[in-house]
UniProtKB/Swiss-Prot annotation:
Protein name: Transcription elongation factor GreB
Sequence similarity: Belongs to the GreA/GreB family. GreB subfamily.
GO term, biological process aspect, one: regulation of DNA-templated transcription elongation
Free-text function comment from the UniProt entry: Necessary for efficient RNA polymerase transcription elongation past template-encoded arresting sites. The arresting sites in DNA have the property of trapping a certain fraction of elongating RNA polymerases that pass through, resulting in locked ternary complexes. Cleavage of the nascent transcript by cleavage factors such as GreA or GreB allows the resumption of elongation from the new 3'terminus. GreB releases sequences of up to 9 nucleotides in length.
Gene3D superfamilies: Transcription elongation factor, GreA/GreB, C-terminal domain, Transcription elongation factor, GreA/GreB, N-terminal domain
MF terms in GO: DNA binding; RNA polymerase binding
Domain of life: Bacteria
Species this chain originates from: Vibrio vulnificus (strain YJ016)
Entry-linked Pfam families: GreA_GreB, GreA_GreB_N
Keyword terms: DNA-binding, Transcription, Transcription regulation
Length: 160
């Protein structure tokens, strides 16, 4: 089951996406569909077919966001989180081979588009890291076996 938590930044991005889709993009595509429909035969009208499909995709996303945003719990930074890994943390980890990774633990719906360096709170890596501290060793189950990582740093975006 997906966790229904989101960072303030993630919530604002999804709200902005919903506003854009509903107020700007959908009306634009609706106009194109109307124009293409006015040309007559719709069976071989590529503009009509393409824009109608695009309109369905927009409507699907708008329905999802309209339902999701009121139900989601926004998780803001709290000073009690300092020093431990919790939701919203930026975590840098390293394995014995010297491979270093840095990512932020966020809700599953925040991982889209240009969201680089984010992992879902529902992922095995995030689950293994929760409540750990700097210099702790973490064992993460993977398809190829258990992987060991060491926590180098934990940071939070405090300006949320």
């Amino acid at each position: 089951m997906k966790t229904k938590m989101i960072t303030r930044e993630g919530y604002n991005k999804l709200k902005q996406e919903l506003d854009y889709l509903w107020k700007e993009h959908r009306p634009e595509i609706t106009q194109k569909v109307s124009w293409a429909a006015s040309l007559g035969d719709r069976s071989e009208n590529a503009d009509y077919t393409y824009n109608k499909r695009l309109l369905r995709q927009i409507d699907r996303r708008v329905r999802f966001l309209s339902k999701f945003l009121p139900e989601v719990k926004i998780v803001d930074y709290a000073p009690q989180q300092e020093g431990k890994v919790f939701f919203g943390a930026w975590v840098e980890i390293e394995n014995e081979a010297g491979e270093v990774m840095k990512f932020r633990i966020v809700g599953p719906e925040e991982i889209y588009g240009d969201a680089k360096g984010y992992i879902s709170i529902d992922s095995p890596m995030a689950r293994a890291l929760l409540k750990k501290e700097v210099d702790d060793e973490v064992q993460v189950p993977t398809p190829s076996g258990i992987k060991e990582w060491f926590i180098n740093s934990i940071e939070y975006d405090k300006g949320q």
